[in-house]
């Protein structure tokens, strides 16, 4: 920690301002701006997020209280709440979306060699969604049930570093599986998801990338076994099978070989059946990689706090 400088100023040292400036120039964000630049808006909202502010008035009050200390972070003067409200409403959101992608690319490089607990050469991602409840009185456009409002946040979480590779916000009634088609697939990567994403046509698209998917098999899965590998019962593996889909319509969507791995969780006693197109990874590593999917649940808890 550096004496004499605020924590906020030291955190902002890691923000690549040149990248932010490029995003602002790309969309003309600072044209005809009198007082609150895009970067000052970004700093004010970072301060609000990091300190848990709950309203524009709360942000304004706290910034006025600590304003002089934030001068060296780049925030020359605390913005009035009306100015900040106008900026949040009218500024081009693509400035901050593009900058977010630049930060994600930077984080990806930093965590490229982060251990996963399994031997894996490529990237690994967890795909899931969560519904964020909204007050219908304040957000009447977010209605999705008779008395409830909300949005659904679909997230692809990089398991090396546990940060989001992308986030897509949709109406709450959009089904999870529709987002599989939005994936820009990375060759050699692993995509881990729960059984709500089972779509064999999309799985075949992942297989042809070529990339890997890992999910829980649905209970009514019709599977034709062709080969069984020895199962390591000491590590909770009940069976390790390769085969094809038995149901004709499903096999038409996914005609290639699949692998089915049975696992008993020693901590909870639960029995799980995994489905993947990876036929070489040890079965115990398949189970361990699926356990890492829990990181996205922790990420959602953090977001909702």
Cite the ranges covered by each PLM segment.
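Single, function-defining residue in the core of a domain
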Residues: 1-58, 62, 91, 98-106, ...
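Short, conserved aromatic-histidine micro-motifs
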Residues: 109
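Major-groove recognition helix of helix-turn-helix-like DNA-binding domains
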Residues: 73-91
